Amino acid sequence: LSHDYFKQPNMNAETSMVFFFQAVEKNAAAWIFMIAERWGGSVLLRDAIARATKPLTAGLCLDLKQIKSMQHIKNEQDLYVLAQTLIDMSFTWAMSWISLNRQFQDENLSEKQQLYIQQAVIQVQLLFRGIANWQ
């Protein structure tokens, strides 16, 4: 996803999740590889993936700083931990989404996908509600 993605008008959690899952579907093989090798691959691959995710995490941290509801978080490390958490959650969401596409067909798939989007949105909302009260 590009930085332009974050500048969409009327962006909300559900729209963000839909865009995210569309990106996952377009690049499912890459997601599967990254997820499988991030924890289960050779040390060389695990280290390479860790190096590759650091700039993503740092970039997300910068994006989070721009969000009005994050302005009260002054500790840079706290924002970085939040970015890491979101990156980790994205790997879980991606693999679960890919698994849905493999397990279900037709209208069952659409129904399961909608339920999963709602679940992911609730997870994000709960996370950000907690952050709103972070001191």
Residue ranges and their predicted role:
Residues 1-29, 79-86:
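Hydrophobic alpha-helical connector segments
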Residues 25-47, 95-102:
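Amphipathic alpha-helical segments used for helix-helix packing
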Residues 7, 66-74, 135:
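Surface-exposed helix-capping loop/turn segments at secondary-structure junctions
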Residues 69-74, 100-114:
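Short helix-coil transition/hinge motifs at the ends and kinks of transmembrane helices
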Residues 129-135:
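Membrane-interface aromatic/basic loop that binds lipid-linked glycans or pyrophosphate carriers
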Residues 22-23, 43-70, 80-95, 118-128:
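Amphipathic alpha-helical packing segments from all-alpha helical-bundle domains
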